[in-house]
Amino acid sequence: MARKFELKDYRNIGIMAHIDAGKTTTTERILFHTGKIHKIGETHDGVSQMDWMEQEKERGITITSAATTAFWKGKRINIIDTPGHVDFTVEVERSLRVLDGAVAVLDAQSGVEPQTETVWRQATNYSVPRIVYVNKMDKAGANFEASIESVRTKLNGNAVAIQLNIGAEADFSGLIDLVEMKAYNYDGQKEEIEYEIPIPEDLFEKASQMRLALAEAVADYDEEIFNNLLEEKEILPEQLKAAIRAATITGNFFPVVCGSSFKNKGVKKMIDAVIDYLPSPVDVPPIKAFRDEEEITIEASDDQEFSALAFKIMNDPFVGSLTFFRVYSGVLKKGTYIINSTKGKKERVGRILAMHANSREEIDEVRTGDIGAFVGLKDTTTGDSLISEKAKTFVLERMNFPEPVISQSLEPFSKAEIEKLATALQKLANEDPTFKTWTDIETGQTIIAGMGELHLDIIVDRLKREFNVQARVGKPQVSYRETITKSAEVEGKYIKQSGGRGQYGHVWIKFEPNPEEGFDFIDKIVGGKIPKEYIKSIQKGLEEKMQAGILAGYPLINLRATLFDGSFHEVDSSEMAFKIAASKALSRARDAVGTVLLEPIMDVSVFAPSEYAGDVMGDLSRRRGLVREQETRSDGANVIRGHVPLAEMFGYSTQLRSMTSGRGTYQMQFNHYEIVPKNISDVIVKQRAIKEDD
């Protein structure tokens, strides 16, 4: 089957922002104006097309990334609407990994907010070109220029307006396109009709100056415009458009547009900007892949062998497991086999679906640039590479996900539900790489861990709604970590040689802090002192002990272990003996390597009237917090930002409401790990102390 759209006419984009900036409403308006839906839904009414989970409709927030496709002026736009709440940052992360461009939505009153900074940083990590859409221009306190300035100062982004608003707040009526130098107003029952008007006289000079500033901003990336400016020649809209596009795609420039999605103003022009300035799959650098540890690139072309990345797993009540994927090369027809090159497993593609939020359309094939879903893959999880059977094996660049920072115990109401609970939790863990579940060895309790209290609330809610499992939930607990601060060489022995076949494992390992994140295992055994077949077991013994912890039962992170000496016995040595010997070495190293406890430090932003600012800052300090910044917004609210240990933030919402007479709100997200102060660490370690292995 031939292509309906050339690859250059694809736009794979994400809508990203801070919570309540209007992402989902913006996506709804795009679908309405492109003819994908015929009735506009509102998130506050609980009838939004893109928010399809029950919890999303009730809470008016986006939890999972819904995918859909729209068509505009001969272009195919694949859209992923991502969550703005910090607890669901993994959804943003995995969406950005498979997108070619993004629309960053700002609230015109607030400008850049804390979660804007997070998603912007994620987009920068994946080199995703962006346009900025300043939404809610009709809101009290809306300020287009201040919003642009906040992108420059807080995000260090070269943001330049390509539009000028006509009026603001209640007087926001339209906009001026600075590229074309045309003005537009809006009419109709929902103001969905856009029509051209003369540029208002009182704004003509300002618009001309802003167009010149725009040309000067892109002149650094376009020689023709640079020369035209020098020679004071006219710069045509086509020239300016081409220069903006080139600068945006390289990530050097962020065009800024404005509007009010709720009022339908500026949405069509924003869709035009997506088409004009964001890249197609052929405009971005080829995707990186690895073949036998050698880096290669994959060309975006139907003529190449099929390759795709699984970026999301979802359990659907009607069809079962859905694997969302992005095709990077080649063509795949349903009914064929593919290889999961990450796991070395063969999978059969029975059905392929094109998705629209939670509705679906069955299709026969997918091609380069497509985003779709496979039904019923058995072994594939988020981040896995999928390639054709014929392809010489390679793995696409993987996604990295943060570890959970908060945990709770779960206890089913009846013993009959224990197995049901375990099955349900495993399905949810397969969907979400930042959600972990395990059984506490000491207490036998089921533990769930995630990115925040809301994250775990949603998990418990889904257990009840989707799997009909009810459970008692324990108090939230901080997910501490352990690490080492010094180097030491330690011996580990496991020798039992009395009667029958014995056990013999003997290692010398140097432990040191790993300057990079993660675990590095280095084998420096020479002369056959330990046979090669036991080396993997030694590494596994260390990894298992790291997971169990050596100080207070929390996972040990950022460790480098160099195996440099040891001995073996011809008869009594075994993989198990060396695994235990390695585990004992790490246990024995606990004091010598200066093991310490780490705690998650949160980025906290508190919004409160200025008269409460002193009380708020004092309270944060009492919680071991470090206040980093204070600013007054255009609506008079004070924003106080700081770093506070998660352990001190439980119950904070109740305290804040009491302190501010119900007028304060806050948001927080994980920032980094820090060493726990000794007086607090000593108490935690005493409660959970691990005995050193004999």
Curated annotation (Swiss-Prot):
GO molecular function: GTP binding; GTPase activity; translation elongation factor activity
UniProt xrefs under InterPro entries: EFG_II, EFG_III, EFG_III/V, EFG_IV, EFG_V, EFG_V-like, EFTu-like_2, G_TR_CS
Family: Belongs to the TRAFAC class translation factor GTPase superfamily. Classic translation factor GTPase family. EF-G/EF-2 subfamily.
SUPFAM superfamilies given in the database record: EF-G C-terminal domain-like, P-loop containing nucleoside triphosphate hydrolases, Ribosomal protein S5 domain 2-like, Translation proteins
Signal peptide: none
Protein name, per record: Elongation factor G
Source organism (scientific name): Mesomycoplasma hyopneumoniae (strain 7448)
Subcellular location: Cytoplasm
Role summary: Catalyzes the GTP-dependent ribosomal translocation step during translation elongation. During this step, the ribosome changes from the pre-translocational (PRE) to the post-translocational (POST) state as the newly formed A-site-bound peptidyl-tRNA and P-site-bound deacylated tRNA move to the P and E sites, respectively. Catalyzes the coordinated movement of the two tRNA molecules, the mRNA and conformational changes in the ribosome.
Keywords: Cytoplasm, Elongation factor, GTP-binding, Nucleotide-binding, Protein biosynthesis
Keyword GTP-binding attached: yes
NCBIfam families, sorted: EF-G, PRK12740.1-5, small_GTP
Binding positions for GTP per the UniProt entry: 17-24, 81-85, 135-138
Principal location: cytoplasm
GO cellular component, one term: cytoplasm
PANTHER family to which the protein is assigned, alphabetical: RIBOSOME-RELEASING FACTOR 2, MITOCHONDRIAL, TRANSLATION ELONGATION FACTOR G-RELATED
Superkingdom of the source species: Bacteria
Gene3D superfamilies linked to this entry: 3.30.230.10, 3.30.70.240, Elongation Factor G (Translational Gtpase), domain 3, P-loop containing nucleotide triphosphate hydrolases, Translation factors
Residues in tr-type G domain copies: 8-282
Biological process annotations from GO: ribosome disassembly
